[in-house]
C-alpha cells in the first residue's frame, strides 16, 4: 500500500515536471532540469552506488574527477528526463542524431541481413530505435518495464 502511494506521488511530481517542461520549451527545460538534477540528484541513496561504480571503472580516480563525472551524469539525466516529452519533436526533425556507419545499415537492408543493435542508457537512448524505424527497418525492442505503474 505504501509503495502504491509513493508511486502515485512520484507520478504526480513527474507529470508536473513534464507539464512545466512543455510550457518552457526544449532548450530552457534542458537547462533547468539539468541544473535541478545535478543539485538534488546527489542526495539520493544511489550516490553510494555511483561512487562504487566509479571506483570499479577507474581504481585511482581523484575526488575532483569523480565529482565532475557525477555532476555531468546528473546533468545528463536531467536533460534526458525532460527530452521524453519532446520525442514527437525529435521524430519530425533529424538534426539531433548523427548515424556513424550508415553504409553498414544500408548494406544490412539491401542484403536482408539480420542485425543486432546494442544500446544502453547513453543520453536519450530512445532516439536510436526511432531513427532506425524511420529507415523502414523492422525492429524488435527489448526493455524492462518501469516499476511505477502510474
What do the PLM-derived regions correspond to, one by one?
Residues 111-150:
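Catalytic core of membrane glycerolipid acyltransferases/transacylases, capturing the structured
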Residues 2-119:
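Membrane-anchoring hydrophobic helices of lipid-metabolizing enzymes
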Amino acid at each position: 500500500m505504501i509503495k502504491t502511494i509513493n508511486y502515485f506521488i512520484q507520478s504526480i511530481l513527474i507529470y508536473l515536471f513534464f507539464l512545466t517542461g512543455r510550457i518552457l520549451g526544449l532548450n530552457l527545460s534542458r537547462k533547468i532540469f539539468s541544473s535541478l538534477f545535478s543539485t538534488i540528484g546527489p542526495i539520493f541513496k544511489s550516490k553510494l552506488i555511483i561512487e562504487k561504480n566509479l571506483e570499479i571503472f577507474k581504481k585511482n580516480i581523484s575526488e575532483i574527477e569523480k565529482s565532475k563525472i557525477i555532476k555531468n551524469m546528473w546533468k545528463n539525466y536531467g536533460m534526458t528526463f525532460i527530452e521524453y516529452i519532446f520525442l514527437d519533436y525529435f521524430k519530425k526533425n533529424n538534426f539531433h542524431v548523427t548515424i556513424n556507419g550508415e553504409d553498414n545499415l544500408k548494406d544490412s537492408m539491401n542484403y536482408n541481413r539480420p542485425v543486432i543493435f546494442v544500446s544502453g542508457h547513453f543520453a536519450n537512448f530512445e532516439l536510436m530505435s526511432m531513427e532506425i524505424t524511420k529507415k523502414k527497418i523492422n525492429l524488435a525492442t527489448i526493455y524492462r518495464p518501469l516499476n511505477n505503474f502510474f
